[in-house]
């Protein structure tokens, strides 16, 4: 059955309350340093790719068993499950495209029955993080490409896509979708995007689903 619409979401501080790399940083004893770089990247003060390299380098030596510990500390944003279940019932597809890590995002996607997911992957040797990423880096341009690909796979126009995110890395994706929503976002993001949600309840996105239906 053809999809009725597509929702593409960021993960850290959007679908979930936390920034996973900050939680990993705490485990590495680098919490304050990594959180500082994350904040600068999300507000657009520094380049995302460079910030990712800097932060991942600080995780070098962590055992891969740390992912299970971090996953237990993650909280879905209020309304996340209800939003996704409602959209699936309406015939929509849901995709996650994250500057975070497959090692965590895949588990979230599985639990929520997400249709599509793409994130960064951390390089591992002998059961420990090397301090580098492996494969394609999910940056702002990649997020746009993935949104377009998923829309195309479902024979949807971009006008039938909603995107939700909170960081500077999300701005091009938000402006590519028919409706792009800055979710509890940094000022620079809100200034660049037409639609905003300022309360941490993802069920509010359903109001924009109705708005999209009204456009048709």
Curated annotation (Swiss-Prot):
GO CC terms: cytoplasm
Chain positions recorded as Mg(2+) binding sites: 10, 12, 166
Catalytic activity: O-phospho-L-serine + H2O = L-serine + phosphate; O-phospho-D-serine + H2O = D-serine + phosphate
Cross-referenced CDD domains: HAD_PSP (cd07500)
GO molecular function: L-phosphoserine phosphatase activity; magnesium ion binding
Binding of substrate, residues: 19, 55, 98-99, 143, 169
Cell membrane keyword on record: no
Pathways involved: Amino-acid biosynthesis; L-serine biosynthesis; L-serine from 3-phospho-D-glycerate: step 3/3
Active site: residue positions: 10 (nucleophile), 12 (proton donor)
Pfam families given in the database record: HAD (PF12710)
EC number(s) from the headed UniProt entry: 3.1.3.3
GO BP: L-serine biosynthetic process
Alphabetized UniProt keyword annotations: Amino-acid biosynthesis, Hydrolase, Magnesium, Metal-binding, Serine biosynthesis
Necessary cofactors: Mg(2+)
Family of this protein: Belongs to the HAD-like hydrolase superfamily. SerB family.
Full protein name: Phosphoserine phosphatase
Gene: serB
């Amino acid at each position: 059955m053809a999809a009725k619409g597509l929702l593409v979401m960021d993960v850290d501080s959007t679908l979930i309350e936390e920034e996973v790399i900050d939680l990993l940083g705490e485990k590495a004893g680098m919490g304050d340093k990594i959180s500082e770089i994350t904040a600068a990247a999300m507000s657009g003060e520094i380049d995302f790719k460079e910030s990712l390299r800097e932060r991942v380098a600080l995780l070098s030596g962590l055992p891969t068993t740390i992912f299970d510990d971090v996953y237990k500390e993650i909280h879905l944003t209020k309304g996340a499950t209800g939003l996704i279940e409602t959209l699936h019932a309406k015939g929509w597809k849901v995709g996650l495209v994250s500057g975070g890590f497959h090692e965590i995002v895949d588990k979230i996607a599985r639990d929520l029955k997400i249709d599509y997911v793409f994130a960064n992957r951390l390089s591992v040797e002998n059961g420990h993080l090397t301090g580098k990423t492996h494969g394609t880096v999910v940056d702002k341009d990649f997020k746009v490409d993935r949104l377009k690909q998923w829309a195309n796979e479902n024979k949807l126009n971009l006008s039938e896509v909603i995107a939700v995110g909170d960081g500077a890395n999300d701005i091009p994706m938000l402006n590519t979708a028919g409706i792009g929503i800055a979710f509890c976002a940094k000022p620079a993001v809100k200034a660049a995007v037409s639609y905003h949600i300022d309360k941490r309840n993802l069920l509010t996105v359903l109001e924009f689903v109705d708005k999209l239906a009204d456009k048709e």
